[in-house]
């Protein structure tokens, strides 16, 4: 089974040891990006996963490519050109101090890319699944067009399409997001959202919910999922449910709605002690795609995806380094964290 994802792979610069930007003397240099993170998860699970983007032909662009290759991601369809690799600065929060993310991605290679840079008919030959997020079209009108052409080609090739709404207010307005994502979601089969994105992008929200106070009305998300499915004729809608007690401790669960069976399945809830939250949603997406491609039931699929994401929260960096057996062990109820000898 082959999966293709498209998006921006960025340099991630982060102070060491929970330092603030204003006190840091050095920064850790790694790579990450929503759809690239999903591709790494799937490659670690043993699937044929390819990532599509545009990166400069210089050494930093090559380092970005190499960061994917080391985990087995197919990088052969990455277009080379342009001058910049996008950057994001990440200041990790702790306790009552929230994390801070600052973007420096203007004029990156993918932001300036054109639809003609990608041969989607060739890219989707023999592909089973295509994934993108709402972060990528937020880069500009030209990238919206790239995503639209990708979705149209994927449909023409009979490829399943998933999208994580992933609204980023630092990249575009709600009005811009709604206009673009309305067009793109017409092609989507599986939608992933969270307690904020459905509201920010489409104005759909759960009642009696206070995400910052750690209060979620799980039943209210049935209505959110159904409204999303009815609006765009999705086959499935996944809603991740995060209870933010503080920056270091979150409650984490999810719901998966299967339209054909009218089945709403809620996962077990994990109480997380967070090492690194970045990439947590992407690891959920990767877990869900893997589970659905492997024919897991609605309940088993959401349990696998949530367990994968719970484990990612224990790992530094954007990428999820867990194996299928490790995820299945947690999904099956073994969360003891005991030493394996």
Place the predicted regions along the sequence by residue.
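Positively charged, low-complexity intrinsically disordered leader regions
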Residues: 1-20
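Short catalytic helix/loop segments, enriched in acidic residues and glycine
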Residues: 20-39
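Alpha-helix C-terminal capping segments
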Residues: 30, 38-48, 291-294
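Conserved N-terminal subdomain of the carbohydrate kinase-like
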Residues: 48-137, 327-341
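Conserved phosphate/ATP/ADP-binding segment of small-molecule kinases
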Residues: 171-260
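Conserved post-catalytic alpha-helical subdomain immediately downstream of the catalytic base
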Residues: 264-334
